[in-house]
Amino acid sequence: MNLRLELTRFLSLGYVLSSSFMFWMGLSLFTDCHSPIVVVLSGSMEPAFQRGDILFLWNRNEKNNVGDVVVYEVAGKSIPIVHRVLKQHYDRSTGEQLLLTKGDNNNGDDVPLYARGNYYLNKTKDVVGTVKGYIPQLGYVTIWISENKYAKFGLLGLLALSSLISSED
């Protein structure tokens, strides 16, 4: 075992991980979204977006218009929701924009999904971003890995095996 070679591999791995992290943080700053890329997890927005589509978000617009597709998070729930703005108005006391959303494939609006006692989303507090682009079906890989525990272990095993194979000279 060559210590210098092992340290070089370790540093290369650290470089790749830190570069990936910095890219994600830079993208987050550029788009003003803590999660600038999300995967559609349900069919509530069909036919516009299918389960497994990857969405690219932008949160630098001052307001959202009726018809915009937004991603929002509700306090106490960890999964972001992708739905279309159905109505919008402004709070008279604060001047903040309030939004009512609905999934294209749903029968009713999203009020039952909002935090208890809220009938609208607050644009600045609840909305993660507005959808500006997408790649169809590419997100199925992440859905498959997250829903299949064997896939997680298999992927980790493949990574470990590849590092063992590549370390043998």
Curated annotation (Swiss-Prot):
Name the EC number(s): 3.4.21.89
What are the boundaries of the region C-terminal short (CTS) helix?
A: 154-165
Chain ranges sitting on the Cytoplasmic side read: 1-9
**Membrane topology term:** Single-pass type II membrane protein
Q: Which InterPro entries match?
A: LexA/Signal_pep-like_sf (IPR036286), Pept_S26A_signal_pept_1_Ser-AS (IPR019756), Peptidase_S26 (IPR019533), Peptidase_S26B (IPR001733)
The first-level EC class reads: hydrolase
Family per record? Belongs to the peptidase S26B family.
Q: What is this protein called?
A: Signal peptidase complex catalytic subunit SEC11
